[in-house]
Structures are given as C-alpha cells and as structure tokens.
Amino acid sequence: MQPTPINLPVGEFDDIAGLASRITPISPVDDFYLIDTALTKPQVDPSTWSLSIDGEYVDNPISYTYEELLNRDLVEREVTLSCVSNPVGGDLVDNAIWTGIPVTELLDEAGVQDPTNDQHQFFSRSVDGFTCGFPLPLAYDGRTAMLALMMNGEPLPIDHGFPARLVIAGLYGYVSATKWIERISVTDWIGVDGFWQPRGWSKEGPVKTQSRIDVPVSGSTVNSGSVAIGGVAWSPTIGIEQVEISIEDANVVRANEAFSEDFWEPVQLANTESDETWVQWRHDWDATPGEWVMRVRATDKTGFTQSPFPVAPAPDGAEGYHTTVVRVV
C-alpha cells in the first residue's frame, strides 16, 4: 500500500479565537508530542530491518520484512495517544490517523496460544533496547491494537518510530507505544517487566479520563461580552459522555478558600470518529468584568467522572480538574 496524503479536517469549533492554533481534531505530525528514552533517534534501514514474533506462548515464531508488511492489506484508524507523564492540563496528548496491521493478525499467524489468558503478556522491544508490555487479552478485546507503518497518510517519521511502531488505544505509551520496534514476544505477565517498571512506574497503564481548557489561555485578559471557551477531553476506548465547566469569581474562591460545586454546567461536544479519539468541546460565556476561575471535568461513557483531587503523574497517570484563571475587562 502506497502512502495517501490526508487532508486534515477542520474542527467544528475552529471559529473559537485562538483554538485552531492550539488544538485541531487531527494533530499535524510536526506538532505531535515526543517523549522517548532514546537520546539519539535510531536510524533504521528498512531494507535490512525485520520484525520477529516469538515467545514462550507462540507455536510458530515468524518474522516479516518491511516490504512484506507494506504489501499486506492495511487498515486506517484515528487514535488519541497520551503520555503517562502528562500533568493535568498538559500537552503530552495528541490525535492522529494511523495506518497499519492489526497485531492480532500477526499474532495469529505466529500461532499465539490462549489469547484470552490475562497471565500472558504482549511484550515488545525496540532496536534501541526499550521494552514494554501489557496483558495479551487487551490486543484482542476490540480496541485498535496496530503495528503502524504510516501516520496521517505518510510513512512514519523517524521521530515517531520509522519503520514501524505500536499504537494501542487506551494505554499510556510507557506500556505500549514501542517505536522502532523489532520484536514482539508473548511471555508471562509476572516476572517480565519493561523499561519503566524497575523505575517506579506501574505495571499496568490504562489511560485515565481527562479534560483540558485550551482557550482562553490561563492568565490572559479578554473583553467582556460573549467569550467562547474551548478545549478537549479524552478517555480512549471508553469515550466521553459529558464535559462540564464551572466558572467562579476568583475573589470569592480566595475568600472562602474553597470552590463551590454549584456552578457546573454542561458544554457542547463536537462529533468524533470513535470512542478512541479525543473530543473537542466549547462553551459560550457571557463574561462580565473581574477575575474568574474556570474548572473543567469530564464524565466517560461508563458514568465515571474525573476526581477533583490532584494526583501526580507517577506512578500511573495524573488526576484532578484542569483549572485556569482569566481576567475580563
């Protein structure tokens, strides 16, 4: 399959002042976040590279060349990825269109044993030695679990893992997003750890439900009258049911040394490709002069609403409401 250029879609809420420059439905490749353990990005020659699939629970170990993988029937999926080190309100989350091969096809060709056994691990290795893993059944539960060869219609850039990388919806990258991949092994879950577990990060890494205010930017000044507020929320594989915003007088919050829970109201959500992507949201606010504190929270499609209590990113992802302050004149 040859790369096909993709015209990135226009966001439903791009009319919000400043939003399109900060967040779009599909993240341009050059703007997609980068977090790696590799100080120097591996330069892989696709003519000599291969991907091997093996392990204790594989009956027929197999390997594939880059050309063999490109010549297969490829699928295209839109998936949001995020980093476990992303703080509340942070920008280490992006959305792209990925093209590649479902890993289940490759595992089945290798004769994987008992794919529903949660004591078996999908364990991957990069050419630079990075390793990570997740429970094998997650590759088979219907989520996008892909060996990606293209990103937004073009071959993977070197920075994003050329010639191939993993894209697993709903898992933080530290347990799933192996770039420059060279090996997939089906191993035991217990006793086989990836790069980050000895360094204090959790063995499992499901993405937590999150939301963010992108505009107006915290600390900015806006004119009174109609002000459009916008941002994103995400809970890949589960999906976002509702996003709410609370806007309070900053002086009252300071005087009470607490927030009120009386001001939450739902916002408008944009359409999404699937539950594996982030969703843009907007709220039109009749702003009056003063200093205002904004908070946002999301509820996913299981009915779970974000916790207001701050939790640091380590060891398994940040929690809390993204909070901003703006001045209206």
Located regions from the model:
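Structured, non-membrane catalytic/scaffold regions adjacent to prosthetic-group chemistry
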Residues: 2-329
